Structures are given as C-alpha cells and as structure tokens.
Design a protein with these regions (language model features):
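N-terminal targeting or signal-anchor segments and their processing/structural boundaries
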Residues: 2-685
Length: 685
C-alpha cells in the first residue's frame, strides 16, 4: 500500500508565512536566509509504475515520479523488498524520478512490497518522505495484510535498528499445512528459521518499529534477526535473534472513525444552576471516514544472542620478553594447555613456568614467564591445546604450534650507538677519566604496590591492592596496619589475602573491621615482598579512608507486578550497573548510595543466579524479562527515599528513559526553529 506520513504546517508557520508574504515580495529562494522561509514540506509522490496495488505485473523495474527534485539518503540500508532478494536491488534517482530495479526474477502469483522508509528526500532541504512503500502482485490477486510491532534489546530495552523481522507461513486459513517438511509441526517454524530465508520481512527503524507488508491470510511463525551475512536466516552464532511464543494470525477490518468539526462561535449552556455562566464550543459537523484496522500492530519482540559464539584462537603475541598474551574469539570453559618446545628442544609444561592472569570469561589471558631461560630466549616455540568450534558447530580439542619472537626494544642508548659519528670527535681533556676506568652505577629497580580503589573507600568495600608483578615472596610480618585516633596512629591486626583469580591482587582485612569516617595507613617495610623477577618492594606507606555515613543516601523500592524472583539494579547516567539488590517481600533496599543521579532496572531472575540470562531458541526459552523505571532518581546525602514501582504500568516500549538511551533519533524540529529565527531577525515575531 502506498503511504506517506504527511505533516501539516503548524498554524504558527502558516500565519507567519502569510505575514512575510505581505511584507516581503520577491523572496523566492528556498532555504535562503535572505530569500524566504525554509522548505519544510516532504516530496509528494505523483505516480508510480507499476501503480500501488497493481496486479499481473511482469517487469522488474519500478519507477516513482515526485512533484520535485529528490535525492536518496542511505537507501540501501533503508530499502526492504519482500519476498527477500538474493541479489540487491539497484536504486537510482534522477531529478524528480526514482527507479528500483530488482535483480532477482519475479515469482509467479506473488505479492511484492517495496518499502523505502524515509530514504527519499527533497533535493533542497532534505525533507524526507516518510513511510514510502509500494505493493504490487505478479498474479491477479494481491495480499494486503500487515504485521507490525517493535524490536527491543532484551537486556536493556534499547530499540534495535536495522534488524529484519520476518515470517514463515505454516498453515492456510482452513488449517491445512503450507509446507511439507520432515520435521514435526511443533518445531516446524524453528527449523525453517535456521534452514530457509524469510518468506516476507520488514526492517526495524530508529525506534525499533517494524512493519511486514503484503501478508496473505493464514497462520505464521514470527522471528527477528540481525542478519550478519545477508541470507535472511539464522545460521551464524554471532547473530542476535528474537521470536514470538505464539503463532500469528493477521487480520484486517474496515472501520470508521468520527472527526468533529467545531463551529467558530461558542454557545452558553444552562442545564443546571451550576452550569450557569459556562460556555461550550458548538459542533458544526461530524464527519466519518473509513480506514483499515490491521492486526497485530503492537507486538514486542526481545532480541538476544544465544551466547554460542564460535571458539577459535584469535591472537597470540609476545609484547615483551616476560609476557605472552592470548586472545580467543569467545569465552572458554577452561584454560588452554601450553607446552614449550623451544629453546633447547625440551618439552616444558606451561603450568610450571607460567603464571596466568585471566579475565572473567577466559577469552583474554596474560601469561607471566617466570623462567629466565625462556624469557631470555629470542624465540619461543609454543604448543597450545584448546577447544575449537568445528564446521559442525561442535567444540573439539585443537592443537596449534606457535612461534613467538622476542620484540626488539629500541632505547635511547641503542639509538645513539647506531648514529654515525660526525667529525673527528672531541679532544680528551687532561682531567677527563677514560671510559674503561669509570665505575658503572648499580641501579636497583623496585616493584610497585598500589591501591585498586583509590584513597577513599565506599562503606563496605574492602581495600584492595595490586603489585606490579606476581610475588615470589611476601612476609606479612613486615606489613603494618594502623588507624588514626586523634593525632595518634594505633596498630591493628591485619590479614593479607591473595585473590583467587588475579595473581597480583590482594585484599586487606582488619580486626576489628574498618569504620566509616576513619583514616588508615598501610606500611610495608623494605623487602617485605619480592616478585618473581627478584625485584624487591621499597619501603612504602599508603593512606586511605572510609567515607562517612553522612555522605550517602538510601532508597527503598516497593515493587509491584512481579514476584520475589527478581533483582533491581541502580544504574549510572550511562546505563551501567552501580549497585544490585534482590527483591524480598516486594521490596528492594539500597543503603549507602553515593550522592548523584541514578536510574533503575529490574530483572526477573527466573533461575535465581543473580544475573541476566539470554534465551534459547531450541528450548523455546525467552530471555529473562527486564523492566526500566522511567524516572531519574536524585540521591542526596543523608536522605531516605521511597519509590513505588509497578513494573507493568508503562508499556515496555516507553519504559527506558530517553537520557540513558543510546539510540536517539533526531527530532524533526530544526527547520521550524530556523524559520522562527529568520522571522525574528526580520522583526516579524
């Protein structure tokens, strides 16, 4: 169906245009500050070939003719052709015309839809013609039903842009099967999604909205896909998907709506004494107009990634003599097995000569080489065994042999030695000492100890420290913890606890525990620690302080609409989790919240693991439901806040606050403001 969302000029601009026309004759230059108002009207489609709704169409070239010169804006990103095409259509604009030439052969007795969204703009001001689409059929009947809705990212309700939402027709209106397949009817739709392209599809816009045009009567399975390879089917583990649990049966119905035309004058009403002196606008005419009510129109799909990314070795490097960095394309379940084959052609197991520093998902690993024979070698020959995803999608053991060269480090001394000598050199003075008689200076390098969280700690956060290299020795008797009391420093017992994952991090525990608004200091005596390369720790003193209770606010949420199987996250203004609290007895409580601005998100934690979990297509498992509080929370020190939150009171598509949305479509107010500014300069408003 040919549509164009037309915008009427506002009363203000109409009046101002008339005023300007009465005072400024000859202002005919569109968009010129000295030549008239800016053009705000989008192009108007005058004709098309084939015409909208045309049947028995046989040619592959579609022509559109507009009322003014037009241009194309990101047309290949915005164009959607259904049925989906194997070869991309060729789209061109010339003056007032746009042509779309399909490269695939037309299918018989098939309804085609061409959706250009807002890709066509006028040539002067770039006003887009929104909702431009064309429907035609190669047979004598045209299908005209529609399916519409929104696609949101499941974890953060962000609108998903540029994804395909497509359908597979499973059953005719009489219940007979449309597709004969060896799979069972229960899993038919899922199988089609992974094996065949969409039969019809729409593309999501900047708001995540989609519309699938030209649907025939019947029963459908609906999916969404961020298509990584342009084949309109789910065959890459990196692709995000969404699905609807129920089958979709589109419908359309002719309806009428009433438009009231009001009279210019007002009439007094005196139905009762309380109404005396009041006025009502008089109704002039009630006009009825017909429209087609398409259903469904408000579907909400939640996009997710199943997390089944292909595993393979992405990179292995030796940035310096003592490090080996390994990066995998996806998270791993366990560490790889490393064996050194060189130097000296000996097999040395990596566990005995390496210390691994992994990230949380085990896809990025940093190894410290602690054996001097290895880190002094110019070349390391390394054998690595790890899980690799094969062509069948299975994770199987794979062994690679990797050669790593020690990088050449160019110092200033090296550079000076490489420089050619100029002239004859200077003459040695009588009092100069010969180079061979000079005594070289002994330079001792020390390892470093620093705080992870800085000098000011939030209440309840234990102080953590990090050393510059893994430790070989640590004498806790040479570590001293003190707290400040008035002008004195009082000794305290301490525990120095190594991190179970990060080999260079330690947690400091005190007895008794750390107190708010209290200053502490940790002193390490000389040689209290020594790293695996023999570097000692110089005498070090680090001071830190825990914040005062008066630095915080507190907030209590009263949750409605979900059970206790949920948790709430306080979010920063950049949509990042700051704190998390479990919903208990309909409440989520946050204490010791630093002052500032926050937002809130709730996750229905179905498996009670304290984190968001994506869905699973084969298990028909949707991602865990997420809700946003459409409100900014301003937390002040010492204040206690309460907030009632019915998570289902607001439509899901309207829950996420605009301030934390990443995808923010540009508001179309610029040209109105330009006209107002232009007239204001002329003194007309």
């Amino acid at each position: 169906m040919l549509t164009a969302d037309k915008r009427d000029k506002s009363a203000l601009i109409v009046c101002l245009s008339a005023l300007l026309g009465a005072t400024l004759s000859g202002c005919a230059s569109i968009g010129s500050p000295g030549g008239g108002l800016y053009d705000e009207d989008p192009p108007v489609l005058r004709s098309s070939d084939p015409k909208d709704g045309g049947t028995n169409v046989s040619k592959q070239k579609i022509s559109l003719h507009f009322n003014e010169n037009v241009k194309l804006n990101n047309v290949m990103d915005k164009l959607t052709v259904s049925p989906p095409q194997e070869k991309s259509a060729v789209v061109q604009s010339n003056a007032k015309n746009v042509t779309i030439e399909l490269q695939d052969s037309l299918r018989p007795n098939t309804t085609y839809s061409i959706d250009l969204a807002d890709a066509v703009q006028d040539n002067n001001e770039g006003n887009p013609m929104e909702g431009l689409s064309l429907l035609f059929s190669t047979g004598d009947h045209i299908d005209s039903m529609q399916i519409a809705g929104f696609l949101l990212n499941a974890e953060d309700l962000e609108p998903v842009t540029g994804a395909y939402v497509g359908i597979y027709r499973l059953f005719e209106p009489d219940g007979s099967a449309c597709i004969k397949d060896s799979v069972t009817a229960e899993s038919l739709g899922d199988s089609l999604f992974m094996r065949y392209p969409f039969e019809r599809a729409g593309k999501t816009d900047a708001y995540g909205a989609f519309k699938i045009l030209g649907c025939a009567p019947g029963t459908y399975k609906l999916f969404a896909l961020t298509d990584g390879n342009g084949n309109y089917k789910y065959d890459l583990t990196s692709e995000n998907i969404a699905f609807v649990d129920t089958l979709i049966v589109p419908s359309m119905e002719n309806r009428q709506k009433a438009d009231t035309v009001w009279a210019d004058s007002q009439v007094a009403t005196a139905r009762d004494s309380s109404a005396l002196g009041t006025t009502e606008r008089a109704i002039d005419t009630i006009r009825y107009s017909g429209y087609i009510d398409y259903k469904p129109t408000g579907l909400v799909l939640l996009s997710f990634n199943e997390g089944k990314r292909n595993r393979y070795l992405d990179d292995c490097s030796r940035p310096d003599s003592i490090h080996i960095n390994v990066r995998f394309a996806a998270g791993m379940d366990s560490l790889p097995k490393l064996t050194f084959l060189a130097p000296d052609s000996l097999r040395v197991e990596g566990d005995s000569v390496l210390i691994c520093e992994p990230n949380a998902t085990l896809d990025t690993l940093s190894y410290w080489i602690k054996d001097s024979v290895l880190y002094c070698a110019d070349t390391l020959l390394l054998e690595m065994t790890y899980l690799h995803t094969d062509t069948a999608g299975l994770d199987v053991p794979c062994t690679d042999t990797i050669s790593l060269l020690k990088p050449i480090v160019r110092t200033q001394t090296n550079a000076k030695q490489d420089e050619p000598k100029k002239g004859k050199g200077r003459r040695r003075r009588k009092n100069d000492k010969a180079d061979e008689d000079s005594v070289p200076k002994i330079v001792i390098t020390y390892m470093e100890l620093k705080q992870v969280y800085g000098q000011t700690l939030d209440i309840g956060k234990k102080p953590r420290f990090e050393v510059s290299a893994p430790l070989a020795e640590c004498d806790t008797r040479k570590l001293h913890l003190q707290r400040q009391q008035d002008s004195l420093w009082i000794d305290m017992p301490l525990q120095w606890v190594p991190d179970s994952i990060h080999p260079r991090r330690f947690t400091l525990l005190a007895d008794p525990h750390f107190n708010p608004a209290t200053a502490y200091r940790l002193t390490a005596d000389s040689a209290a620690m020594k790293d695996i390369y023999g570097q000692p720790l110089n005498s070090t003193t680090i001071e830190f302080k825990e914040r005062s209770i008066d630095d915080y606010g507190h907030i209590l949420f009263y949750i409605q609409g979900v059970t206790d199987e949920a948790f709430v996250q306080l979010l920063s203004t950049k949509d990042q989790p700051i704190q998390q609290a479990k919903v208990q007895n309909g409440q989520a409580k946050f204490v010791h919240v630093p002052t500032g601005s926050y937002f809130a998100r709730l996750v229905v934690d179905s498996n009670r693991n304290g984190k968001f979990d994506a869905g699973n297509l084969k298990l028909h498992q949707q991602p865990e439901q997420v809700y946003y509080l459409n409100l900014k929370l301003e937390i002040r020190a010492t204040w206690n806040y309460t907030q009632t939150w019915d998570v289902t009171a607001t439509e899901l598509t309207k829950q996420k606050p605009e301030e934390v949305k990443i995808n923010k479509p540009k508001e179309k107010k610029e040209k109105v403001s330009k006209n107002e500014e232009y007239l204001r300069k002329l003194g007309k408003i």
